[in-house]
């Protein structure tokens, strides 16, 4: 037979670069026919089989190995079982039933072991069969893996059965030896299972070896580290410079990040150390030469949520490290290629650490893009590149023909968006375009513009319009003037002007403006004698002003400027002299005076007069500037005194003194310096103390010995405070208390301070590592050991929250109060806690008696194990023996166990496990199943052996066949006809229907109407219930029942029905039975607890039937069929109880929107549509009917939903008093904006419900649109004067309600009442002005808080009464503008007085 062997290797091309063949697996395929007859399908099928065969065979080997291990475990467990059985024979006893179970479990173990053997044999057979042909390799490997898995499972069952055998054997007493024998059989069977599993493993391994010749799969490992809320650095490889040979490692890493996402990235990591020494090391610039990372996947996944890779260079080598952030788990690594001079530490040899290794240089991942995950311009380094549009932006334009009009052209352009274009008009059409001229079109917002350039002249035409005008067939056209299209005289309004190279105008009066346009224009006034004037006149010839210059001479030249009022008044000229001097009677300089020196010498003898006064609105009316890096000062000098200088030094600090160098003068302490902190060389004495934060010295991250922190005689101060503010900040701090790393505060306190060698200190340290306080003392430089602090009481009692005792704890009494915890064992009366079993907790007394708790919470009492071997319980008192209960045993390891009662009765269990119950001699033994004091049904065993049974003796089982009859006992405990099956099982008496043929087992209630009529609406058709025993009889009806009822009269077209569940509340009788659960015929679920509805309404199952029973209820019946209905008094609730467990409690009421329908055969489901709404609302009864919702919280879809966009908004809706319309009031939009749902309508807060504080980044934006306001009027004189007066009242105040608080902050402003008084004093009505506000309210009651819930679980609101009251308020922004106008008036008046 011809054999063909083909070797194939996968090829991949990425980014136009060939990938080396060594990265991808080879497949060796053997086909059982000649090369000439091989088809492509044969090759494909063989490759797929080979690819699957290798992993399957490998899995078969793994499963078989696991089967062997499980069988070995089974053997070990069987050995343990045998040992336990031996111990059982000498230690304890149990029931015969337990022994039988043990034997059965051992038998199960044997059976499972045989199953394991058979499964292993199956694995062997499948493995052998899989070698028969290459085309069946994959299937055979899968079967082998499955069979080996079965072997593993059965072996596991064997181990479990052996474990059951061990447990049962431990409890066995009567048949301990039998258990040992059965366990031995289990051991033998498990050994057989191990042998068979080993055979299966060998066969699978043999098959794997054969399959590995055909398949060479990629080696894949688990990433060695998984992170939770921590991050680590992991060393995964080391590569050494190979010189001229190869050194290469290629890895494919998957699932390396993207926590919480349903998809991830694949990282291809290329590593090579070749050329390392030539490159003279690894840098951030050349790292990609040695470590290159290509990432395939969605760019939407954050780059910092993935594995990141880098190198740490050594001498001739480098290590490869990965930074693994939090919550990266279950990552896989495939080795695509590996040469020599490489060391891979995966899966073994890796190193992980929390801190970044020294010298770590990261190589950023380069992304591989595909058709779905496309790069952005930024990814390609083309942020500023222009995108080429569909119609020529950056490319070629479009051409349009047969354009009929300007409107037609714009519509054509609009259809294709912004573009380059050219067009040709239809013959005879009136279109403002240059035929075949190129142009540009833009559409921005609702505006359009088209520019068209004639190709042979350059003449430009422009078309413009808006969407509204375009819809009305309006387009504006314009032809631009230029050198190729010059305007005529008439085009520019000069049709009547003669143009002969200049404009000529006769006469010396011009009616228009005169413009002089040249590089250096000028007007010359040439005076032959006298003054030269430039006059400014009124139309009537009256003078407004003049600029004139009198004749000059050798010593004087002047220019005068004069202005006059309308009545000809002028009180002074402004004169500019030739020497630069200016003269003015009253000068006002509005901006700046520049001068070398200025001196003001006031000869006024009035000492209260002012030499210089500077006023204005500027925040810096005087600025002293020195063109130097040195000091600048203001001087003060009196006679017979050196000048005092106030100024700033070169550091900008404010100082005062006599030295020109302010560095030598005293600094002035400013608020900024106080806030920032400053040093004081001398001792500061705070007579009244000080308040505010006390900042400790930060010693974090310092190398420091706490022993060095002392206060000696020469050291200033009595207390010093130090703080380590981080967990790692104390790594280099020594002599801390044990267990303290960082995060602590240390107080050093001076107690004695006689000299530098005669002093006493104390150190107190508080740390969060242990949440403890520690103290130690220093005497003359020698420190005592650290001790944990405790609290002492007046009577020397010690009360601690938690205390660890390493030695002995002595004293007369130990009290652990409240919920206190004693974490450890306790020895009492000399008891040694070392006798306590290591895993238990308890009390050891005296010679060894123990009260302890076992590992599963069992309470265990044990004596000291002496010769008495007794436990005595004395309920009547410590010395009362008559009522004691005594537990004893005859041997420490076997023998009898006995419970003796003080009255003489006893219960004993012998060594074989049989219980013996004995009474005092001559007394009887009573068995009372109905209770200690109830003799009914009792059984009595007399001293002579008689057995008296007060009841029937029933057989264990009754088999009813066709030849037998089962009598039924008639019951009188019910109305009507009733029969009972009588049973006496303490566990269960059941009645059932058994179907052994595969069909259903159903119990039906068949009901007819009277006289063979149809059943009626709400007729009880059947039910099931429970009737408890009352002591002498059963209840007349069920205390809990399930009823089936008809919905409407039955007919050929109506088979309607509904269900109700009736219960009787605790403490009530069946006459108070409540139909608490009703499942209506329309699918509604009604929950009606006790007291919610009268018993007359027991048949209500819908809104429709409730309206009929209670006409005034009058609720909309359209609510029927919509789901859950809960009727309860006061406070119906839906309680979502969600124990947290190991996750997070997150109960939810969730609406699930979608398009489509599940009600028809299409079953189409589509994306959520805009406007889908989820309401949480309330409706009420208006006295006539229930109406629709009048208040709601509505969650809405703000737009259509898709995979990348699911916008929602939340809207709060209410109905105001006096209205029946529900309106949306406030909403949170899809972008998070809190917005009122109507403009200029809703307030935040009111007079007696004010918002305490509003935090914002920017100020509020208030509408001030001129289109919405009347004209702004000027303020009257009284208003201006009132504004000035109000400004003078501004000061600081505090809230009266904060009078008893510390650290009260002062607020700046004034009261409304004072502002009202001032305005009224100027004859103004304050309440005509918007900045004066007044609100009042009537007395009303509100809920202030909710107390503990009522006994019935309803809410417990606590009300308070808000008394009638009122508030005065300001609109501060308007008040500030009002006051600002007063400031402006004052400043203007000052400027006028200064002549400015």
Swiss-Prot record:
It is found in: Virion. GO terms for molecular function: serine-type peptidase activity. Residues 187-214, 1263-1396 form a coiled coil. Residues 51-133, 145-203 are annotated as: Disordered. GO terms for biological process: adhesion receptor-mediated virion attachment to host cell; lipopolysaccharide-mediated virion attachment to host cell; proteolysis; symbiont entry into host cell. It is an enzyme of class 3 (hydrolase). The keyword Protease applies. One of its GO terms (cellular component) is virus tail, fiber. Residues 81-133, 157-181 have a biased composition (Low complexity). Its EC number is 3.4.21.-. It comes from the Viruses. Homotrimer. Interacts with the O-antigens of host lipopolysaccharides. This is Side tail fiber protein pb1. It comes from Escherichia phage T5. The lineage of its organism: Viruses, Duplodnaviria, Heunggongvirae, Uroviricota, Caudoviricetes.
């Amino acid at each position: 037979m011809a054999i063909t062997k083909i070797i194939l290797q996968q090829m991949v091309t990425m980014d136009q670069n060939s990938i080396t063949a060594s990265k991808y697996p080879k497949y060796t395929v053997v086909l059982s026919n000649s090369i000439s007859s091989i088809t492509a399908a044969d090759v494909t099928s063989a490759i797929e089989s080979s690819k699957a065969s290798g992993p399957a065979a490998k899995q078969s080997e793994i499963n078989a190995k696991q089967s062997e291990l499980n069988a070995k475990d089974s053997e070990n467990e069987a050995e343990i079982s045998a040992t336990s059985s031996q111990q059982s024979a000498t230690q304890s006893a149990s029931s015969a039933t337990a022994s039988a179970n043990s034997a059965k479990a051992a038998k199960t173990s044997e059976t499972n072991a045989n199953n394991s053997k058979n499964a292993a044999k199956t694995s062997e057979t499948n493995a052998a069969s899989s070698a028969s042909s290459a085309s069946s390799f994959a299937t055979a490997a899968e079967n082998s893996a499955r069979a080996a898995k079965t072997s593993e499972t059965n072996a596991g069952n064997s181990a479990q059965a052996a474990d059951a055998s061990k447990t049962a054997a431990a409890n066995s007493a009567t048949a301990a030896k039998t258990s040992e024998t059965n366990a031995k059989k289990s051991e033998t069977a498990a050994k057989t299972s191990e042998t068979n599993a080993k055979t299966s493993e060998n066969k699978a391994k043999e098959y794997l070896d054969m399959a590995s010749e055909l398949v060479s799969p990629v080696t894949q490992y688990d990433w060695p580290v998984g992170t939770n809320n921590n991050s680590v650095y992991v060393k995964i490889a080391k590569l050494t410079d190979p010189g001229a040979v190869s050194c290469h490692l290629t890895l494919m890493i998957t699932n390396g990040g993207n926590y919480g996402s349903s998809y991830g990235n694949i990282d291809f990591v290329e590593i090579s150390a070749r050329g390392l020494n030539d490159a003279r090391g690894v840098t951030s610039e050349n790292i990609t030469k040695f470590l290159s990372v290509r990432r395939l996947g969605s760019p939407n996944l954050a780059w910092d949520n993935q594995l990141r890779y880098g190198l740490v260079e050594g001498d001739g080598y480098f290590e490869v490290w990965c930074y693994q952030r939090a919550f990266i788990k279950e990552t896989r690594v495939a080795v695509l290629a590996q040469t020599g001079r490489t060391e891979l530490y995966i899966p073994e040899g890796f190193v992980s650490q929390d801190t970044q290794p020294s010298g770590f240089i990261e190589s950023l991942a380069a992304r591989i893009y595909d058709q779905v995950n496309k790069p952005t311009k930024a990814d390609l380094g083309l942020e500023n590149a222009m995108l080429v549009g569909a119609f020529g932006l950056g490319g070629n334009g479009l051409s349009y023909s047969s354009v009929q009009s300007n409107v037609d052209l714009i519509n054509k352009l609009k259809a294709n968006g912004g573009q380059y274009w050219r067009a040709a008009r239809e013959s005879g059409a009136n279109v403002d375009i240059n035929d075949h001229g190129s142009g540009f079109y833009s559409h921005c917002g609702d505006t359009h513009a088209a520019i068209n350039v004639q190709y042979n002249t350059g003449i430009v035409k422009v078309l413009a319009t808006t969407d509204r005008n375009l819809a009305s067939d309006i387009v504006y056209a314009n032809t631009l003037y230029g050198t190729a299209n010059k305007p005529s005289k008439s085009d520019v309004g000069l049709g009547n002007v003669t143009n002969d190279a200049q404009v000529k105008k006769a006469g010396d009066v011009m009616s228009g403006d005169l413009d002089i346009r040249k590089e250096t224009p000028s007007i010359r006034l040439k005076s032959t004698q006298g003054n030269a004037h430039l006059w400014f006149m009124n139309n009537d010839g009256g003078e407004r002003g003049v600029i004139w210059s009198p004749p000059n001479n050798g010593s004087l030249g002047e220019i005068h400027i004069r202005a006059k009022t309308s009545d000809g008044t002028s009180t002074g000229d402004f004169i500019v002299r030739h020497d630069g001097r200016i003269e003015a009677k009253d000068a006002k300089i509005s901006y700046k005076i520049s001068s070398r020196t200025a001196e003001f010498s006031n000869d006024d003898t009035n000492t209260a007069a002012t030499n210089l006064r500077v006023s204005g609105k500027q925040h810096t009316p005087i600025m002293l500037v020195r063109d130097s890096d040195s000091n600048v000062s203001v001087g003060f000098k009196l006679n017979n005194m050196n000048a005092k200088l106030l100024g700033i030094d070169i550091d900008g600090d404010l100082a005062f003194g006599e030295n020109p160098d302010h560095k030598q003068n005293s600094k002035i302490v400013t608020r900024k310096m106080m806030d920032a902190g400053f040093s004081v060389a001398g001792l500061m004495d705070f007579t009244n103390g000080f308040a505010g934060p006390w900042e400790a010295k930060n010693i974090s991250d310092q190398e420091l010995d706490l022993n060095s922190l002392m206060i000696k005689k020469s050291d200033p101060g009595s207390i010093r405070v130090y703080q380590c503010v981080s967990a790692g900040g104390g790594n280099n701090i020594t002599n801390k208390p044990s267990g303290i790393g960082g995060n602590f505060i240390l107080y050093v306190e001076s107690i004695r301070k006689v000299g530098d060698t005669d002093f006493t200190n104390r150190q107190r340290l508080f740390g969060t590592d242990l949440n403890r306080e520690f103290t130690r003392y220093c005497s003359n430089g020698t420190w005592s050991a650290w001790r944990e602090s405790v609290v002492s009481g007046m009577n020397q009692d010690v009360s601690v929250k938690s205390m660890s005792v390493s030695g002995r704890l002595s004293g007369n009494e130990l009290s652990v109060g409240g919920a206190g915890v004693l974490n450890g064992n306790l020895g009492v009366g000399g008891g040694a806690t070392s006798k306590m079993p290591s895993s238990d907790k308890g009390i050891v007394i005296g010679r060894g008696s123990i009260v302890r708790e076992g590992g599963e919470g069992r309470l265990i009492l044990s004596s000291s194990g002496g010769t008495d071997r007794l436990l005595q319980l004395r309920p009547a008192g410590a010395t009362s023996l008559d009522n004691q209960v005594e537990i004893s045993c005859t041997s420490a390891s076997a023998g009898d166990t006995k419970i003796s009662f003080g009255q003489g009765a006893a219960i004993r269990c012998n060594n074989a496990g049989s219980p013996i119950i004995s009474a005092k001699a001559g007394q009887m033994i009573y068995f009372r199943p109905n209770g200690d004091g109830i003799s009914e049904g009792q059984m009595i065993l007399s001293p002579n052996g008689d057995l008296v049974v007060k009841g029937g003796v029933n057989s264990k089982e009754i088999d009813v066949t066709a030849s037998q009859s089962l009598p039924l006992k008639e019951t009188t405990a019910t109305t009507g006809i009733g029969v009972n099956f009588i049973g006496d099982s303490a566990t269960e008496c059941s009645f059932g229907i058994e179907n052994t043929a595969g069909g259903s087992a159903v119990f039906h209630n068949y009901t007819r109407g009277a006289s063979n009529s149809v059943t009626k609406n709400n007729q009880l058709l059947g039910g099931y219930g429970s009737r408890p025993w009352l002591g002498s009889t059963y209840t007349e009806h069920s205390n809990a029942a399930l009823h089936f009822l008809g919905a409407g009269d039955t007919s050929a077209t109506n088979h309607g029905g509904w269900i109700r569940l009736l219960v009787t509340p605790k403490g009530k009788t069946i006459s108070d039975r409540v139909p608490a659960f009703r499942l209506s015929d329309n699918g509604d679920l009604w929950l009606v607890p006790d007291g919610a509805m009268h018993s007359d309404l027991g048949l209500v199952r819908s809104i429709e039937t409730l309206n009929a029973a209670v006409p005034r209820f009058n609720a909309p019946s359209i609510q029927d069929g919509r789901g859950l209905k809960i009727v309860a008094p006061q406070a119906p609730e839906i309680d979502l109880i969600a124990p947290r467990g190991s996750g997070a409690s997150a109960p939810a009421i969730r609406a699930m929107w979608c398009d489509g329908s599940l009600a028809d055969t299409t079953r189409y489901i589509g994306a959520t549509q805009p406007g889908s709404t989820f309401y949480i609302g309330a409706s009420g009864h208006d006295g006539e009917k229930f109406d629709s919702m009048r208040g709601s919280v509505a969650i809405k879809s703000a737009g259509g939903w898709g995979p990348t966009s699911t916008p929602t908004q939340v809207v709060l809706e209410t109905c105001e008093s006096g209205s029946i319309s529900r309106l949306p009031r406030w909403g949170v939009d899809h972008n998070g904006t809190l917005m009122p749902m109507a403009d200029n309508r809703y307030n935040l807060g009111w007079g007696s419900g004010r918002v305490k504080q509003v935090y914002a980044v920017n100020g509020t934006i208030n509408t001030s649109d001129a289109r919405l306001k009347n004209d702004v009027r000027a303020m009257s004189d009284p208003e201006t004067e009132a504004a000035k007066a109000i400004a003078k009242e501004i000061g600081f105040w505090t809230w009266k309600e904060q009078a008893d608080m510390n650290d009260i902050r002062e607020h700046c402003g004034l009261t409304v009442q004072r502002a009202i008084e001032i305005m009224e004093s100027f004859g103004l009505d304050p309440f005509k002005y918007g900045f004066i506000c007044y609100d009042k309210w009537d007395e009303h009651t509100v809920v202030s808080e909710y107390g503990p819930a009522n006994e019935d679980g309803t809410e417990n609101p606590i009300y308070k009464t808000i008394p009638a009251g009122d508030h005065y308020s300001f609109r501060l922004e308007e008040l500030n503008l009002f006051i600002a106008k007063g400031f402006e008036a004052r400043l203007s008046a000052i400027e006028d007085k200064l002549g400015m």
